[in-house]
């Protein structure tokens, strides 16, 4: 009788698992199951999920804007080179109105950084600087161990709008490097036209000559995060985009799109994946006064969504921009099982 009852209970448990769509609860013994959401959990009554906030290392930045070409610094990528043991870091430096630069630093411990004098580019008559190339706005870098071409071991995706080189449209561009220092840009850049059609960033809503190109279709904009998606076996970019408002207001809200590529050259149409919702003051009126040098509207927006894949889950450190409130950009955790459908 006891055996019969046990078999009945086992069959009922298997039936519940199948009905709930939780077949993947049965993972191999050597697989780590993450409990950051309820995907693998059938029942958890009486439990509380607590996420431990990240702790900032110190009050001082580890990469300070302390060079002549560094009025501000932003948008970095980090990689630990297994051969040298050094951390490599690529970041954007903004000297002012003369455009931006992609710069390089390295470290033995990830805390104390050196900006080597590379001698690759001249700034104010001197090549004693750590500048890699010009106009790599929002550049993101990955190390690609699978590419058979050693000259393309490092890959970068970035926003470029170089009038000097005669680019017709700003947009997402790419570059290759054998060592992370010496870079070659793709001759057909930009590979994806940006989400607005001219070099003004962004144009005013009353600029009639621009209205045909605003966010239609949704495309990439000037914040780009590149990853190798090991789950889907593709290169993927999570980028900022601009959404038009419900009343036709241009550049109403910032949101996040994803595009991917098998060969790093041919990219899919950017797809909108994360956008402001009813909890983000989405009904705020558009702000068209951009005299301060930046675009956007009041209220909460999603400035960018850098992501990575770990075990069977995508994580995004979503940058939430509150331009009309505190002016801060807090980080929110977002989760996805496929890289496209996200929960915040």
Model-derived regions, located:
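Positively charged n-region of N-terminal signal peptides that target proteins for export
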Residues: 1-6
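Bacterial N-terminal signal peptides
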Residues: 7-16
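Sec/Tat signal peptide C-region and signal peptidase I cleavage site
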Residues: 18-21
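Beta-rich carbohydrate-recognition and catalytic domains
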Residues: 23-299, 308-344
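Structured ligand/cofactor/substrate-binding pocket environments in proteins
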Residues: 304
């Amino acid at each position: 009788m006891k055996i019969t009852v046990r078999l009945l209970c086992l069959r009922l448990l298997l039936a519940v698992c199948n009905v709930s769509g939780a077949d993947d609860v049965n993972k191999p013994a050597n697989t780590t199951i993450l409990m950051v959401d309820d995907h693998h959990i059938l029942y958890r009554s009486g439990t509380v999920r607590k996420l431990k906030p990240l702790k900032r290392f110190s009050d001082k930045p580890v990469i300070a804007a302390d060079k002549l070409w560094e009025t501000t610094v932003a948008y970095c990528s980090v990689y630990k080179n297994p051969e040298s043991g050094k951390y490599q870091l690529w970041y954007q430096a903004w000297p002012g109105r003369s455009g931006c630069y992609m710069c390089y630093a390295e470290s033995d411990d990830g805390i104390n950084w050196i900006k080597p004098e590379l001698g690759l580019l001249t700034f104010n008559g001197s090549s004693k600087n750590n500048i890699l190339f010009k106009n790599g706005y929002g550049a993101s870098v990955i190390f690609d161990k699978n590419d058979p071409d050693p000259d393309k071991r490092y890959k970068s995706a970035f926003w470029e709008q170089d009038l000097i080189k005669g680019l017709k449209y700003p947009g997402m561009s790419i570059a290759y490097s054998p060592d992370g220092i010496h870079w070659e840009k793709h001759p057909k850049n930009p590979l994806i036209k940006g989400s607005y059609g001219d070099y003004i960033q962004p144009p005013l809503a009353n600029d009639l000559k621009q209205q045909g190109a605003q966010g239609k279709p949704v495309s990439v904009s000037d914040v780009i995060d590149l990853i190798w998606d090991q789950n889907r076996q593709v290169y993927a970019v999570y980028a900022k985009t601009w959404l038009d408002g419900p009343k036709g207001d241009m550049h109403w809200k910032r949101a996040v799109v994803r595009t991917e590529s098998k060969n790093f050259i041919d990219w899919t149409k950017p797809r909108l994946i994360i956008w402001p919702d009813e909890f983000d003051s989405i009904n705020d009126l558009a702000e068209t006064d951009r005299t301060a040098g930046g675009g956007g509207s009041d209220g909460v927006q999603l400035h960018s969504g850098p992501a990575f894949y770990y075990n069977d889950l995508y994580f995004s450190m979503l940058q939430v921009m509150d331009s009309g409130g505190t002016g801060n950009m807090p980080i929110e955790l977002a989760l996805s099982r496929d890289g496209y459908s996200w929960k915040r």
